[in-house]
From Swiss-Prot:
Source superkingdom: Bacteria
Family per similarity comment: Belongs to the complex I subunit 4L family.
Pfam families documented for this protein: Oxidored_q2 (PF00420)
Keywords linked to the UniProt accession: Cell inner membrane, Cell membrane, Membrane, NAD, Quinone, Translocase, Transmembrane, Transmembrane helix, Transport, Ubiquinone
Localization annotation: Cell inner membrane
The protein's name in its UniProt record: NADH-quinone oxidoreductase subunit K
Catalytic activity, EC: 7.1.1.-
Keyword Zinc: no
Main location: membrane
Catalytic activity of the protein: a quinone + NADH + 5 H(+)(in) = a quinol + NAD(+) + 4 H(+)(out)
Length: 102
């Protein structure tokens, strides 16, 4: 049964990786990163359940707290970027790109 949870977590993680690599919408990329964090939490919870140790569950709670803080900060940043650029496409965020290549 634990193999099923590990398999689900790996599938979720790789769906998140594909979302980060293939998508151009900054909100979709943000949600893919959150999916990867949840997959990591599921792996820790699975191994904590297998070893009957509470350390993994503490790490899961820490991951959930970090994900909540990241979600609030990330969504606020996304809203500000949308207000400034009127788009969530990552191709238009190129202010740091070196334009003068000599």
């Amino acid at each position: 049964m634990l193999d099923f949870y590990i398999l689900v977590a790996l599938i979720l993680f790789f769906i998140g990786v594909l979302g980060v690599i293939l998508r151009k919408n900054i909100f979709t990329i943000f949600m893919s990163v959150e999916l990867m964090l949840n997959a990591t939490a599921l792996i820790f919870a699975t191994f904590a359940r297998q070893s009957l140790n509470l350390d993994g569950q503490v790490i899961v709670m820490l991951i959930i707290a970090i994900a909540a803080a990241e979600a609030s900060f990330g969504l606020a940043l996304i809203v500000l970027l949308y207000k400034k650029k009127q788009s969530l496409n990552i191709d238009i965020f190129d202010e740091l790109k070196d334009r003068d290549v000599s």
